Regions:
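Short, solvent-exposed loop/turn elements at domain surfaces
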Residues: 76-83, 101-106, 373-374
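Noncatalytic carbohydrate-binding groove/subsite architecture in carbohydrate-active enzymes
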Residues: 59-66, 74-84, 204-325
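Structural preference for beta-strand elements that scaffold enzyme active sites
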Residues: 66-70, 93-95, 133-135, 184-188, ...
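Generic structural signal for well-ordered alpha-helices
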Residues: 56, 91, 120-127, 169-177, ...
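Substrate-binding cleft and catalytic face of glycoside hydrolase catalytic domains
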Residues: 89-110, 118-246, 310-314
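Aromatic-rich peripheral "rim/lid" segments of glycoside hydrolase catalytic domains that contact
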Residues: 106, 179, 188, 192-216, ...
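Boundary/entry segment of secreted carbohydrate-active catalytic domains
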Residues: 42-93, 97
Length: 412
């Protein structure tokens, strides 16, 4: 997960265009929901009737023949009965939203003894008791690692400095992976290491890249080191490189260049994680292309952080909410037409995942219901990007992916 602007690919899902006037990030809201209303949320259409929630099939049963069905959670949600019930009924896999990241596990001061495993251990125990798998997220990324990882004699002894940082990295990964050995079946070893820019392969603003670049070192070396340390600590765990915007050709090219380099060096990498934080205009063809590219390298595909933002407006709105025209906050009851558009996109994406079921072994959403989503805090307006609504009830998007006969109404 990153603090970044949402991606807005170039092409639209044709079905979604039925209910949305303009696709692509340039022009504001949908035809049925104009935003020239003084900044107030557009009037919601009455939602059309959905099937009885009690009749909802379990997601893990609907897709068990294709791939694991997962979701990212905070351990505190396990104490909320409605959340725990959703998890145990619908999911076969759990991901820690933050509890397995370095900023949670690693001590903030190197003089402190021990790691903070408690929250992650709680999640693992819950998963084990309910027969669920656990994906580990993440051993390393550019955000959140305590500063002491990178302290040392950069100027006076650059080679010694790089070796010191390397040892800290290897020790940390070894300790964490060993702690969760036999409980975590797959790890996002490195997260968001590819550059967004054309002509630059690696994310060079990462403190890890910068540390390994000191004194003319190979800034990208930390990626190989991380994978080798993880494999040594748990030979049975699947090891992934996890990235956002893999559906965008330029970003995907950078990621694949990294993957190809790792493969050429014999680095133990098992698959690619596709975050897929997308919007209503995502190109399913582009998503399919991303999955195909991984298949061509004989690697596994995991969809790791899926959500679909209901706001289709300039990407600057996601960051600063200051570049008009921006869609006003829908609140917790988005227009039915927007939810229908979202349902069409979810159905199209899950059809793509099924088409690639030979390589897609896991599909996880980043959250389980709309009352708990990073997009609301990140964008500063209420988002509803998941399969269950703010009351934990199945949305049109849910019914769209579990029932091919469910008619998605594009008008009310």
């Amino acid at each position: 997960m990153s603090r970044r602007q949402m991606s807005f690919p170039w092409t639209c899902i044709a079905a979604a265009a039925v209910v949305l006037a303009g696709c692509g990030g340039g022009g504001g809201g949908s035809a049925s929901n104009p935003t020239s209303n003084g900044g107030n949320p557009p009037a919601s259409n009455p939602p059309y009737e959905l099937p009885d929630p009690a009749s909802a099939p379990a997601l893990k049963d609907s897709y068990g023949g294709y791939f694991r069905v997962g979701g990212a959670i905070e351990p505190s949600q396990l104490q909320v009965a409605s959340d725990a019930n959703l998890l145990t009924r619908h999911l076969s896999s759990l991901t820690a939203e933050n509890a397995m990241k370095p900023q949670t596990i690693a001590p903030t001061d190197p003089s402190q003894s021990g790691y903070v495993f408690g929250p992650a251990d709680e999640l693992v125990a819950f998963a084990r008791s309910h027969g669920m798998a656990v994906r580990g997220h993440t051993l390393l990324w550019h955000f959140g690692a305590p500063q002491w990882f990178f302290e040392g004699p950069k100027d006076s002894d650059p080679v010694g400095y790089r070796n010191l940082v390397r040892q800290r990295l290897e020790d940390y990964i070894t300790d964490v992976v060993t702690h969760f050995k036999d409980d975590v079946y797959a790890w996002d070893v490195v997260n968001e290491v590819a550059s967004d820019a054309s002509g630059a392969i690696y994310r060079t603003d990462s403190p890890w890249y910068q540390a390994f670049s000191v004194g003319g070192g190979d800034g990208a070396e930390y990626i190989e080191i991380a994978f080798r340390a993880a494999r040594a600590a748990d030979p049975n765990a699947l090891l992934f490189i996890n990235e956002y915007n893999t559906e965008l050709p330029a970003k995907r090219a950078n990621l694949l260049a990294i993957v190809d380099d790792l493969i050429s060096k014999g680095v133990p990498i098992d698959g690619v994680g596709h975050q897929l934080h997308v919007s209503l205009d995502v190109s399913t063809h582009a998503v399919s292309d991303a999955l195909t590219a991984v298949e061509q390298r004989n690697l596994i595909n995991h969809v790791t952080e899926l959500d679909i933002s209901i706001y289709l407006d300039p990407s600057t709105c996601a960051a600063v909410r200051a570049s008009p025209p921006c869609i006003a906050d829908y609140g917790t009851s988005p227009p039915a037409s927007v939810l229908a558009a979202q349902a069409l996109v979810y159905r199209a994406l899950y059809n793509v995942f099924k088409d690639h079921d030979a390589s897609v072994e896991s599909v996880s959403t980043w959250g389980i219901h709309d009352a708990h989503t990073w997009l609301t805090s990140f964008q500063g307006r209420t988002n509803s990007p998941l399969l269950f609504d703010h009351q934990r009830l199945p949305k049109a998007a849910f019914w769209a992916i579990v029932d091919p006969a469910f008619a998605i109404k594009t008008s009310t």
